[in-house]
């Protein structure tokens, strides 16, 4: 009696393994450097001028930095970090499609953010955000104008 054992090695499946890429291949187990990442030029740190109208119709002006980075495994998705100069306490997610910045309705750290649209122009972004505060539900209207100061490469 002769036993022959034949094992099959799994063939490497080459493709894009970066889930943020337009051409992500979930079945690929070996990256072939073919990944196509969009909106890379929009990622980075922005110096922001923030004019905010509070519930009493008073306007406040603030200057601070906002970081725009990729949202996990969503080729159009982004996260805006430090909106309102609140660090990681207020992170707003959205999408970039062409020059458009699309922010869906969402909750972030108790803040209710209403759906809105903004846009990018060269190295700047512009967006108006309406939100309600966590405890009292006070309405605020925020106009953000950001100019890129640092690129993020990813």
Language model features with spans:
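Beta-strand secondary-structure signal
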Residues: 45-47, 65, 77-79, 117, ...
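Short, surface-exposed coil-to-beta transition loops
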Residues: 60-65, 86-91, 110-115, 138-144
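Generic short beta-strand segments
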Residues: 47-54, 83, 105-108, 126-134
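Edge beta-strand at a domain terminus
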Residues: 124-154
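Bacterial Sec-dependent N-terminal signal peptides
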Residues: 3-42, 149-154
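Contiguous, well-ordered beta-strand patches that form the walls/edges
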Residues: 73-123
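Tryptophan-anchored aromatic micro-motifs
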Residues: 40-63
């Amino acid at each position: 009696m002769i036993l022959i054992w034949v094992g099959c090695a799994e063939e490497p499946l080459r493709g894009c393994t970066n889930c943020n890429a337009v051409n992500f291949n979930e079945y690929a187990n070996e990256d072939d450097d073919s990944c196509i990442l969009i909106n890379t030029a929009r990622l980075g740190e922005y110096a922001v001028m923030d004019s905010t109208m509070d519930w009493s119709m008073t306007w406040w002006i603030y200057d601070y930095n906002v970081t725009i980075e990729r949202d996990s495994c969503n080729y159009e998705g982004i996260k805006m970090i430090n909106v309102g100069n609140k660090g990681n306490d207020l992170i707003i997610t959205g999408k970039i499609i062409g020059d458009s910045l699309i922010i869906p309705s969402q909750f972030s750290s108790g803040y209710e953010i209403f759906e809105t649209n903004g846009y990018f122009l060269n190295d700047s972004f512009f967006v108006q955000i309406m939100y309600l505060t966590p405890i009292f539900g006070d309405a605020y209207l925020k106009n953000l104008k950001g100019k890129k100061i640092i690129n993020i490469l990813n």
